[in-house]
């Protein structure tokens, strides 16, 4: 029989109609001879009533066989419920069953198919097809589908062309680790799965496409955490002849449209802008969460003359004030914060409490001479807790930025209903890598340096600034973009600054340098992490919740057991041998 509608769509206006529904048994109850079934499908749950006085013996026998997650087809008439269930959209009606067919049976599931079930992540991923049956999971993927639909329509209406770029590309340096694919035909050679379509989308601008977009899979072989996966999806944009401001305006309009159409929220435009240096100095992060205060305070000059070498000899002394919550933190709690701080390079964590106007704590005696200045500077009051880090500026900022976020979560200081977007601009072009002992691109080596700082490509690389911009939401980097280099000599200077010889640059990027000899237009763009955006829209804290079949923290799939061993024949065809090292 043909399904009449989704179970979750049945309403009062359907009373009196005979309909056919199909779905899964969510729950079965026997009450006084009557059998009640909660039938679940993609759109919701509908109560079925099977009365032995109204159905044949065969139907009743079939109903008695039903168990959770059986797949069934039912026919019956829609009736008003004697007692409505306000918790269900279908709660005013029920289906009086006249016909019932079991389409498939089901084993007892390893966990209940319901929201809020407590089960390990690996079990959820092992039985992902069951996990995805849960209503909250389905809602997240409806939200994801709606988001991509809005984005496509918005960009289509602005004249962007949706173009697919290659999945098998060339491995290049200056990025995360590549996923490599061996070539059977060109033995000993490898493709790389793209970390982004960066170069190919730039070449589309050289081809005259003017406005490109793509919702595209990307791959990075990097350490995983809550908002990262080895394969992820990004909304990728590139434009020709537009300024930094014009590109940001397009992106803001797109985000505003997504927020309005998916959440019913009007966001204020334009988004605030914050310089990179201000973000680091005041929030201790290049992706600041502006939903709460507790900004970093620079006390370097104020404590320079005190008799406490940890402070007086440090490059930077910075602090955060936990207002009105000193009594929430015991010595043991602060010891835990200290261990947390050490993860970010801090040697320790100094602290004091304000109790009835007096300073208490291990360093209080050293601050007697600056007590009034410190009280005024930090606007200290009773029951305030002050946490200090004395170290390099970078360590102080990073440590206090992480503490700021941790404490705000511990104390429920964050308004979770807020969506605070902002642009972080005026980025440094390079960042120093302790591991590599050299400067590396803060974004990528195709970013345009500012006209005012480009001369430092042959001088002090720390002074080179980029025409780059990141869009941030609630402490997460949603995406990043920039204007790009479009002239060969500038691109060659950039490669030299990064330590490439002319031969290495030509070997890795010769095709791009050659393309720049054929009238490459000024261009720029941006990429937004779709998984991360949907995660935040859905109120989740892990992008696994909005990816249908994600990997776990070991980059493996407990369901399919990927990655897996392959046959000797496959390895022979690729001329590969596996060496095992103890």
UniProtKB/Swiss-Prot annotation:
Family: Belongs to the class-II aminoacyl-tRNA synthetase family. Type 1 subfamily.
Protein name (record): Aspartate--tRNA ligase
InterPro entries, alphabetized: Aa-tRNA-synt_II, aa-tRNA-synth_II, aa-tRNA-synth_II/BPL/LPL, Asp-tRNA-ligase_1, Asp-tRNA-ligase_1_N, Asp/Asn-tRNA-synth_IIb, AspRS_core, GAD-like_sf
Name of the coding gene: aspS
Residues that, per the record, bind L-aspartate: 174, 220, 443, 484
Function description: Catalyzes the attachment of L-aspartate to tRNA(Asp) in a two-step reaction: L-aspartate is first activated by ATP to form Asp-AMP and then transferred to the acceptor end of tRNA(Asp).
Annotated organism of origin: Streptococcus equi subsp. equi (strain 4047)
EC number from the UniProt entry: 6.1.1.12
Catalysis: reaction(s): tRNA(Asp) + L-aspartate + ATP = L-aspartyl-tRNA(Asp) + AMP + diphosphate
UniProt-listed Pfam families: GAD, tRNA-synt_2, tRNA_anti-codon
């Amino acid at each position: 029989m043909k399904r009449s509608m989704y179970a979750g769509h049945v309403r009062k206006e359907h009373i009196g109609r005979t309909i056919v529904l199909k779905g899964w048994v969510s729950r079965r109850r026997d009450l006084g001879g009557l059998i009640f079934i909660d039938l679940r499908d993609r759109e919701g749950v509908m109560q079925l009533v099977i009365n032995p006085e109204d159905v044949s013996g065969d139907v009743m026998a079939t109903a008695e066989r039903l168990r959770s997650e059986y797949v069934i087809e039912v026919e019956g008439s829609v009736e008003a419920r004697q007692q409505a269930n306000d918790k269900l959209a279908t709660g005013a009606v029920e289906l009086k069953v006249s016909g019932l067919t079991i389409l498939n049976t089901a084993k007892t599931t390893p966990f209940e198919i319901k929201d809020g079930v407590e089960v390990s992540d690996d079990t959820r991923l092992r039985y992902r097809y069951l996990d995805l049956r849960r209503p909250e999971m389905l809602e997240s993927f409806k939200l994801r589908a709606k988001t991509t639909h809005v984005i496509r329509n918005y960009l289509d209406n602005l004249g962007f062309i949706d173009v697919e770029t290659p999945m098998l590309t060339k491995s290049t340096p200056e990025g995360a680790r590549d996923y490599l694919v061996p070539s059977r035909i060109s033995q000993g050679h490898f493709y790389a799965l793209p970390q982004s379509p960066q170069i190919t989308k730039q070449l589309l601008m050289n081809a005259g496409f003017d406005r490109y977009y793509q919702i595209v899979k990307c791959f990075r072989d990097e350490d995983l955490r809550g908002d990262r996966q080895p394969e992820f999806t990004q909304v990728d944009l590139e434009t020709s002849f537009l300024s930094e401001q014009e590109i940001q305006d397009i992106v803001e309009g797109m985000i505003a449209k997504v927020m309005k159409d998916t959440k019913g929220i009007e966001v204020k435009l334009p988004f605030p802008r914050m310089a990179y240096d201000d973000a680091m100095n005041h929030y201790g992060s290049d992706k600041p969460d502006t939903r709460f205060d507790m900004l970093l305070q620079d006390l370097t000059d104020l404590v320079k003359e005190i008799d406490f070498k940890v402070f007086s000899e440090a490059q930077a002394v910075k602090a955060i004030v936990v207002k009105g919550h000193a009594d929430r933190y015991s010595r043991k709690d602060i010891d835990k914060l200290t261990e947390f701080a050490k993860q970010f390079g801090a040697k320790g964590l100094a602290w004091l409490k304000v109790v009835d106007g007096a300073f208490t704590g291990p360093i209080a005696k050293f601050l007697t001479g600056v007590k009034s200045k410190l009280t005024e500077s930090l606007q200290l009051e009773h029951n305030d807790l002050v946490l200090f880090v004395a170290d390099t500026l970078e360590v102080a900022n990073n440590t206090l930025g992480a503490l700021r976020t941790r404490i705000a979560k511990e104390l429920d200081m964050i308004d979770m209903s807020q969506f605070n977007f902002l642009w972080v601009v005026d980025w440094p072009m390079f960042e120093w890598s302790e591991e590599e002992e050299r400067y590396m691109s803060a974004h990528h080596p195709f970013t345009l340096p500012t006209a005012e700082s480009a001369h430092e490509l042959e001088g002090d690389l720390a002074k080179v600034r980029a025409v780059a911009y990141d869009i941030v939401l609630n402490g997460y980097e949603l995406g990043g973009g920039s204007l790009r280099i479009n002239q060969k000599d500038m691109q060659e200077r950039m490669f030299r600054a990064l330590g490439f010889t002319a031969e290495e640059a030509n070997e890795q990027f010769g095709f791009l340098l050659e393309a720049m000899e054929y009238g490459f237009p000024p261009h720029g763009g941006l990429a937004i992490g779709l998984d991360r955006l949907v995660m935040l829209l859905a109120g989740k804290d892990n992008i696994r919740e909005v990816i249908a079949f994600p990997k776990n923290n070991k980059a493996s799939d407990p369901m399919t057991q990927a990655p897996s061993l392959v046959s000797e024949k496959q390895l022979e065809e690729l001329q590969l041998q596996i060496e095992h090292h103890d």
